Amino acid sequence: MFTSYGYSTMIKVFLLCLAISAAALIFPLWAQIPIHLTTGLALLFTLYFFRDPKRVAPDEKRIILAPADGKILLVQKQNGNIAGKTSTLVSIFMSPLNVHVNRVPLSGKVTRLHYRPGQFLMAFDNRSMESNEKMEIGINNGEIEVQFSQVSGFLARRIVCQLQKGENVKLGNRFGMIKFGSRVDLILPPSATVLLQPGQRTRAGETILARY
């Protein structure tokens, strides 16, 4: 299954690969082979990147799910992000080989949507949290609020977010993606207990990131 967020890119890559392979037919067979192999691999990688496997959210209450596939880069306490109280920052790094479809971490109402232009530093560089292009999102369920950001990276220069401010969203549902390598940063409220440590892997919509 492929994500609809990638249809336009997949079509463009397919047409480009087809054109290159067709143009290569003017060369001798020995010269055509590496060209066909290269375009074939490029097309296969594109299809692999835009895969969208089925995910089933845990049937549990008072949980916060990982919004992205990847590896935990950072778990850090910080002050003043949510109602002036101590919160926990959790950063997830997505390599180009991870599934890049993002999923809702908490059921509730979308209270914040803010696009912020910026740079395109490497996503594993913690400076990218403040400097890079990103979409800032907030979800409140009446008990807690979770803030998180889709952050562009050096390769990822296209953020897709289909959320609308004021809409109600369900835990584990798809809401967007970041194309070609990136990170997601979450700010969790004081009542949330993070269950993962740096270095551990996550699966969007399935891995329980925290409980509250």
UniProtKB/Swiss-Prot annotation:
Gene Ontology BP terms: phosphatidylethanolamine biosynthetic process
Annotated compartments: Cell membrane
Pathway: Phospholipid metabolism; phosphatidylethanolamine biosynthesis; phosphatidylethanolamine from CDP-diacylglycerol: step 2/2
InterPro entries on file: PS_Dcarbxylase (IPR003817), PSD-A (IPR033175)
Cofactor note: Binds 1 pyruvoyl group covalently per subunit.
Enzyme Commission no: 4.1.1.65
Modification after translation (UniProt): Is synthesized initially as an inactive proenzyme. Formation of the active enzyme involves a self-maturation process in which the active site pyruvoyl group is generated from an internal serine residue via an autocatalytic post-translational modification. Two non-identical subunits are generated from the proenzyme in this reaction, and the pyruvate is formed at the N-terminus of the alpha chain, which is derived from the carboxyl end of the proenzyme.
Protein name, per record: Phosphatidylserine decarboxylase proenzyme
Gene that produces this protein: psd
